[in-house]
Amino acid sequence: MGTESLVHVLLVSFPGHGHVNPLLRLGRLLASKGFFLTLTTPESFGKQMRKAGNFTYEPTPVGDGFIRFEFFEDGWDEDDPRREDLDQYMAQLELIGKQVIPKIIKKSAEEYRPVSCLINNPFIPWVSDVAESLGLPSAMLWVQSCACFAAYYHYFHGLVPFPSEKEPEIDVQLPCMPLLKHDEMPSFLHPSTPYPFLRRAILGQYENLGKPFCILLDTFYELEKEIIDYMAKICPIKPVGPLFKNPKAPTLTVRDDCMKPDECIDWLDKKPPSSVVYISFGTVVYLKQEQVEEIGYALLNSGISFLWVMKPPPEDSGVKIVDLPDGFLEKVGDKGKVVQWSPQEKVLAHPSVACFVTHCGWNSTMESLASGVPVITFPQWGDQVTDAMYLCDVFKTGLRLCRGEAENRIISRDEVEKCLLEATAGPKAVALEENALKWKKEAEEAVADGGSSDRNIQAFVDEVRRTSVEIITSSKSKSIHRVKELVEKTATATANDKVELVESRRTRVQY
């Protein structure tokens, strides 16, 4: 079958590993169902993909379909200091994206591969505006939990009380969810957050929430059934995760080119079952020097084998490079390994891994649950603090090590060591493992043939196919003409438009 006959879906991603990889996982799943996927994101991230060496411009076969990449310039030099201001960058990306995306769609139509649907992730809600202007359906992939989706929804619409400057420590009671303490709700919603620009970025999606015909969630029904049932009455949500776990499509993720992917696995192969603690704080969390030292001494004192991912901060990020305690590597010898990157999915699936010290980002949370690995929670901010509460108190697969950045303290080596020992041996470790294995089984059943997530993704595929037939059978010349009109219209955007976008993003809603 030629690729021209396949339904073509355009994935538009905000740049960054935590944004691109979940959308890429969704893309390979849709490709396995017989779709042709194009993933587009700014060239600034495309350079990282090419550097990693796991990239090709040619369509890659996945199941019955294909996936390919197409990058676009965002209009700023790579070292432009304005990139550090998220409000400014999002406005610039919207200004350029509204010109570029219609051109990509126009080019596809002229090549007899018309786009039938657009899917975006958070931070770029304007993609649904582009789709609507062209008469195309759109969907959104939400890459946090349904619980966090509900929290942001209720905050945006003012449906329940949240902490305020006058009452900063009130608890939050959301329908069909456990009570959230003030430091357990997504921290960007707290009035004292040092990251108000991230609150604006996330809530921007809720302004356009009525435009996508479907909101896909990287979770599974059995994990969050009460809040999913509740929110499904309000929004067209479909849980389709865990996306990384789907057996129908091979793993395809973007990594940093820091090491050979098999290096960690070769080391783990030499360790006994359930003997290694895996430590990783994701791609955006960087700990203070003192905290790194306390974790290091805790590992030395515990005598537990470990694999520790310590990613260096990006150049010019302003984040200080941290050092391990003096003589640390010599003292641990072969009992420990420190790396800059790891193939996390493979690591968590390895039988030698006993538990996972994690920052509780949603990708890592889903990977731990679906791999059956207990966790020690070390959240910092955002949805991480909410995920940590769920892991410890609801899913019961985790031990809480800290409550987040707002706690404003260094976790001592004694506290860390105590958690490490409890999570790897004794009655608590047994209970955590039993619960973790239960969720692993539930996750596998969700993505298996006929499972809850499999049924939802099939329903989504069927709907896109149905609307695709309507689009193709309508006047193709009319469709191309509509795209051409939009391209010409957006090409007239000026620098003043960008200023208006930045100001409107900051002021149109008092988040």
Swiss-Prot record:
Its EC number is 2.4.1.210. The keyword Transferase applies. The active site is at 19 (proton acceptor). It catalyses: limonin + UDP-alpha-D-glucose + H2O = limonin 17-beta-D-glucoside + UDP + 2 H(+). UDP-alpha-D-glucose binds at residues 344, 359, 362-364, 367, 383-384. GO terms for molecular function: limonoid glucosyltransferase activity; quercetin 3-O-glucosyltransferase activity; quercetin 7-O-glucosyltransferase activity. This is Limonoid UDP-glucosyltransferase. It comes from Citrus unshiu. It is an enzyme of class 2 (transferase). Belongs to the UDP-glycosyltransferase family.
